[in-house]
Amino acid sequence: MSAAKSVSIGIDLGTTYSCVGVFQHGKVEIIANDQGNRTTPSYVAFTDTERLIGDAAKNQVALNPSNTVFDAKRLIGRRFDEPVVQADMKHWPFKVVSEGGKPKIQVDYKGENKTFFPEEISSMVLVKMKEIAEAYLGHKVSNAVITVPAYFNDSQRQATKDAGVIAGLNVQRIINEPTAAAIAYGLDKGKSGERNVLIFDLGGGTFDVSILTIEDGIFEVKATAGDTHLGGEDFDNRMVNHFVEEFKRKHKKDISQNKRALRRLRTACERAKRTLSSSSQASIEIDSLFEGIDFYTSVTRARFEELCSDLFRGTLEPVEKALRDAKMDKGQIHDVVLVGGSTRIPKIQKLLQDFFNGRELNKSINPDEAVAYGAAVQAAILSGDTSGNVQDLLLLDVAPLSLGIETAGGVMTALIKRNTTIPTKQTQVFSTYADNQPGVLIQVYEGERAMTKDNNLLGKFDLTGIPPAPRGVPQIEVTFDIDANGILNVSAVDKSTGNENKITITNDKGRLSKEDIERMVQEAEKYKAEDEQQRDKIAAKNSLESLAFNLKSSAQDDSLKDKISQEDRKRVVEKCDETIAWLENNQLADKDEFQHKQKELEKVCNPIISKLYQGGMPSGSCREQARADSQGPTIEEVD
């Protein structure tokens, strides 16, 4: 591959699926992976011999549930003891452990016990997306824009950025998913005049609502709301629980502790859910689900809607909140745009349509690809692309949560109110609470509650060396500065001494240290090298295997009987049989051994086979006719 050009890609790093796009020749290309799919499962699997990412990982999940990791986005930037993490762990077949209060995923890889941070798993998915883009573009890529849910907090954003760094990417910007989708929508429409657009983005694991005003290429986010923990997987969970109960009733057996049975059931439920978006009934047929019992059943759309009714209805709350924050009436919204695969569910569309008094919803953009599309446009802008339709584009995003410090009595004093356009900088002067107080503790919080104990502590630092003075006299200037990625810097200055201290809100909470990240970057390289080694090994094995079978069939071909002596034929067949037998017993041999065996085989057979082809048949060694390097793992079909 040639050296990296300055092209930048847009990656939608999703909970369940990811997608990558690039802007070139004046338009966005959403790039298909090696399986021809334009979205790639955000799955990483570890086996005794290799690591699989994407479709290959998801395809073998029922065979290897406890070492196939997904949903890393539901863990990223969170702490182990958060209630949502504890609740999720009940649904996951893989093991999550705590290390220093942070969640780590535990798997068996190549016979060893390994633990990974969520950032590392996400970085593996990002590497896959990067490779998909590189295969399409034909050169290395290092610059990227990565999207996150608008409602992601500071530590979740920071952790996503870290995942990009571990994947060897220069993350130019972290942008909000609904904002990215709005760019896709706005470019697609190109209508003049001001339009108020509500983006309703319901994906596999997260839910966002954003209201934007689009006018002449300026995208201004007015308000954002959502739930970083609601999506298609929660609907799958409801269906899985329903069928676990049904299995108990019908067969008096509990499958809830059997990982493989649960995984097969979940896959069937996900498929049924998709079917129910276009049909009123879906059947589920799983052979030998548990203890040899076949599970044949069906589910109607009405029953599915009833199972998820509270979750579906709950999606309207953030819509109302966003409208309130944007100080808009629902009649002022010109377009309601659907993004994310879960918006295909008819009931969700109906609830939303009824909420907007029967208004037609806008389905003009592809719900699976819109976010990556917008990210690719933003990537092009940041890389200095001057194509007519993107150069005038300006993106004004907002901070999703209020940010402030704790003042006397545990009160939350907000310096930056939620839905403030970013980047932004706000300064406020505070003072001491007691006479001759020598220092102050600046504690930074995010959240909307009046008391800090109900909000989320992002970090804290001390400002010391304040000269003795009566309370209320010293002037301490606190500045909050949010950059375009939504990441916060806080500084405090004692105006009398010029003494300053500051913090980038990254250290305390869920954030990896620089050393950790560097170590993970090296490990990622190591894993990549191992993956390539494994691919080469499989290629060498397949090459040897196909050569042996092809030679054997050539030697036994009746039409070639006259051209080869009985003795020669016997030698070829025997050597091939010997090689095939060796292969069966040495599946895990090294690449060099396979190549050595291939040379041995060629040494015996080449002279004999070349006699065959002297009569005007294709020249060249038998190696050429046997080049069938089928790459990659063999995948078993799984229900």
Curated annotation (Swiss-Prot):
<dbReference type="InterPro" id="IPR013126">
    <property type="entry name" value="Hsp_70_fam"/>
</dbReference>
<dbReference type="GO" id="GO:0042026">
    <property type="term" value="P:protein refolding"/>
</dbReference>
<dbReference type="InterPro" id="IPR043129">
    <property type="entry name" value="ATPase_NBD"/>
</dbReference>
<dbReference type="InterPro" id="IPR029048">
    <property type="entry name" value="HSP70_C_sf"/>
</dbReference>
<keyword id="KW-0067">ATP-binding</keyword>
<dbReference type="GO" id="GO:0016887">
    <property type="term" value="F:ATP hydrolysis activity"/>
</dbReference>
<dbReference type="GO" id="GO:0005737">
    <property type="term" value="C:cytoplasm"/>
</dbReference>
<keyword id="KW-0346">Stress response</keyword>
<keyword id="KW-0547">Nucleotide-binding</keyword>
<dbReference type="GO" id="GO:0005524">
    <property type="term" value="F:ATP binding"/>
</dbReference>
<dbReference type="GO" id="GO:0044183">
    <property type="term" value="F:protein folding chaperone"/>
</dbReference>
<comment type="similarity">
    <text>Belongs to the heat shock protein 70 family.</text>
</comment>
<dbReference type="GO" id="GO:0031072">
    <property type="term" value="F:heat shock protein binding"/>
</dbReference>
<dbReference type="GO" id="GO:0005886">
    <property type="term" value="C:plasma membrane"/>
</dbReference>
<feature type="region of interest" description="Disordered">
    <location>
        <begin position="616"/>
        <end position="639"/>
    </location>
</feature>
<dbReference type="GO" id="GO:0005829">
    <property type="term" value="C:cytosol"/>
</dbReference>
<dbReference type="Pfam" id="PF00012">
    <property type="entry name" value="HSP70"/>
</dbReference>
<dbReference type="GO" id="GO:0051085">
    <property type="term" value="P:chaperone cofactor-dependent protein refolding"/>
</dbReference>
<dbReference type="InterPro" id="IPR029047">
    <property type="entry name" value="HSP70_peptide-bd_sf"/>
</dbReference>
<dbReference type="GO" id="GO:0005634">
    <property type="term" value="C:nucleus"/>
</dbReference>
<protein>
    <recommendedName>
        <fullName>Heat shock 70 kDa protein 1</fullName>
    </recommendedName>
</protein>
<dbReference type="GO" id="GO:0140662">
    <property type="term" value="F:ATP-dependent protein folding chaperone"/>
</dbReference>
<dbReference type="InterPro" id="IPR018181">
    <property type="entry name" value="Heat_shock_70_CS"/>
</dbReference>
